[in-house]
Structure formats: structure tokens, C-alpha cells
């Protein structure tokens, strides 16, 4: 057969049509409730390795292979892997990420999946981004493009969270996460994405969040540390609360009502917009009395579950801990508050 220019053009058109059809089919095969199904599977989780030396030197890692297994055996369903890729920039125009970053990320993802833990890859660079959101946008987008491409072949048990606690004006955040969304969807059309609210992922800012109506494969993240005077008392980085002490949480009727009011606002938003919610962080700092921490932690986790939210406790190691790596043992009182009995 003799190929003419016209024939070649027709072949290219047909190939383009077939590829387009394939991509559309790939996106359409997910049910409209897929994000809710994913959120149910996320279940109960914990934040890991954000401040672990593993990122700089694997030989100095506090978090070991065994901890993935321990997390699963304790009854957790997900890990939120806290990543800081800005620290691994090669400082070139393309914001190339040092390969050592991907070595650690791959290790954490693969060990999680091996232990049947779902994974949230949490872009945890809010402290830098908030200083100049638009100025740092290009870096965030460039790095997400690299991470997304690198992770595109992982199963849908891996989720991407665009940015932790984006502290900026709502219109700026809506612009940035929209552009990040477009970057991620190029290489990961079926990946479940997580988008949080501004200013510490606070519930009150759900009303300002604008998401693509035609993409239902998105989970919305909120965080909860209220009352902040209780959860952050004695925390050295918290200017307003570092000198506070002795504040209890007794689970009084008024204290419960305050939590329920906040959570009901979030739940009403979720139902109105048909978007699942994940409680990506919650915890009470160690300076609070243990009995109060147990009561608060248990109440928050149970109220999230009553509303069918997934959750990820802050955090496994470092501070607010649920596991004592030095003693190689669970902080049993916090673990039991989070998971009173293993899910059947």
C-alpha cells in the first residue's frame, strides 16, 4: 500500500482519537462515589516521617521497616507521609528535585503498600509557601509535576494532597490549587486528590473553597486543634499558648457542644457539595494532662467516624506522639483513645 500525505494525516487523526477515547474511558470508569469509597478505605490513620532524619540520611532513620507493620497491626488503615521537597531543590530554573528525595519517598510508599496501608502524600511546605504564595507557586507546580510523574504508576491506594495548611487569601489559594490540579491530572487522571481549606485547614473556611464541579475524585481536608489553648498549651512554637499550663478538657456538655457545632458545620458543607471529608490532623500536645488528652482525642476521633470522615492523627513520632521510638513502645493511652478496639 502506498502511503500518501492524506493517508498519514488520517492515521494521526485516528491515533489521536483512540488515545483521547482511552483517556476519557479511564476517567469515566470511576464511579461518581469513588472519592467517598476511597475515603471510607482511608479510615483511621497517622502522620509519619515529616521530621525524621531519614530524609537526609537513611542510616540515621528513626522510623524503621517494622513500624509500618506495627501501625497496621495496631488497627490503622492509612499513613499520611509528610514531605518537604523544597529542601531537596537542585536550585536550577526547573526546580529539579534531588533523586535522594524520591528514594526515601519510594521506600515509604512501598513499605506502606506492602503492609496494606493506604498512603496520603502530603506536600508539607506551607511555612515557606505562605511567605509569598504567588512567588512560590511556580516551585510548587514544578515539583508536583515531578512527583506526580514519578508516582503515576502506583496504585490508587496512593493519594496526593496538594498543600498542607495553605495560609493565604482564599482567592489566591483557589487559583494555586486549580493550577496544581491541572498539573496533577495530566499524569494522574484517576488519582484521588486531597484539597484543604486555608489558614490551618480550618472548618470555617470551607465556604471559601472552590473545586472543579466536573471532577468528583477529590477529598477535602480539614484539621482540628480546638480549643487551641488546650491542645497547644506549653508548645514552644505557639506564641500565644507556649506559657499556658494546667488547662483541662473534661468532656463537659459545653465542650462537647463546641466540637459538635464545628463538626456539624463541616458535615453540612460536605452534604451540600457532595464532597467527602478527611480530618488530616488532630492532636493535643504533651504538656496537657494525660487524662484530658485521652478524653479529647477519643471524642474527636469518634465524632469524625460518626460522620463517616477518615482521619490521620498528628503524629507517630516527634511531638503529639502516639509511639515512643526511644522506648520502642506505643503510648498506650493515646493509641487506645484513637482505636479503642480493632475494627473487625
How should these model regions be labeled?
Residues 57-73, 140-144, 259-266, 293-297:
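Short, acidic/polar
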Residues 60, 67-78, 94-125, 129-159, ...:
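An active-site-proximal structural segment forming one wall of the substrate-binding cleft
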Residues 1-28:
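Bacterial Sec-dependent N-terminal signal peptides
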Residues 52-55, 90-102, 127-135, 163-171, ...:
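The substrate-binding groove and active-site-proximal loops of carbohydrate-active enzymes
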Residues 26-80, 95-96, 269, 335-337, ...:
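N-terminal carbohydrate-binding accessory modules
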Residues 289-344:
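Aromatic-rich peripheral "rim/lid" segments of glycoside hydrolase catalytic domains that contact
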